[in-house]
A protein has these predicted regions:
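Conserved inter-motif catalytic segment of the P-loop NTP-binding fold
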Residues: 14-95, 128-129
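Single conserved hydrophobic/aromatic residue that forms the stacking wall/gate
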Residues: 1-6, 10-11
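Phosphate-binding/switch region of NTP-binding enzymes
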Residues: 90-167
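Alpha-helix C-terminal capping/helix-to-coil transition sites in glycosyltransferase folds
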Residues: 5-6, 66, 119
Length: 167
């Protein structure tokens, strides 16, 4: 799901390149195969897979014409504190950072990740191939289907779940 969101960011804004900082999976063959599997080859010149710790990423982002959108997988693998996050955000105010987090239920795992969630302008929880907005920028429905067939199978075939965590 995250890779498709990265692809969507590349497609929607042809002028920005997206860095997917895959600390958890790295730039392995698995990641490359997923890129092909999800049809992201068409945006590959706008999407770069990297595996860099935060100090190295900061060096990259200080360069002229660096990435304007950075997806970080995952917040826990950065080993950042909330203070580290604030420093990153303040040093690069014109960059969009998307943090993927391990979860405990529908919330990020760990105090620092939870604090980042509360600071974020937009919070997105993904379940069953559907992304749900938890923030104030929800659009018409507050949800975005990432993969139609997967979402159909999960929500309609797998049992009586309620979309969006509604009971």
């Amino acid at each position: 799901g995250v890779r498709l969101v990265g692809s969507e960011m590349c497609i929607r804004d042809r002028y920005d390149r997206v860095a997917f900082n895959s600390l958890e999976e790295g730039t392995s063959l698995t990641v490359q195969n997923n890129l092909r599997r999800f049809g992201m080859a068409e945006v590959s010149r706008h999407l770069a897979f990297i595996k860099e710790d935060i100090p190295t990423l900061k060096i990259r982002l200080r360069r002229h014409k660096s990435f304007n959108i950075v997806i970080i997988d995952s917040f826990q693998y950065t080993q950042m504190t909330y203070r580290d996050y604030i420093q990153l955000k303040e040093e690069f105010p014109d960059k969009l950072f998307v943090f993927i987090s391990h979860a405990r239920g529908k919330n990020p795992k760990g105090d620092a990740a939870t604090s980042v969630m509360y600071d974020a302008d937009l919070k997105i929880w993904v379940e069953g191939y559907v992304a749900f907005s938890k923030g104030r920028y929800q659009g018409a429905t507050g949800e975005y289907t990432i993969w139609e067939k997967g979402a159909y199978d999960y929500w309609n075939v797998a049992g009586p779940k309620q979309k969006g965590g509604q009971a």
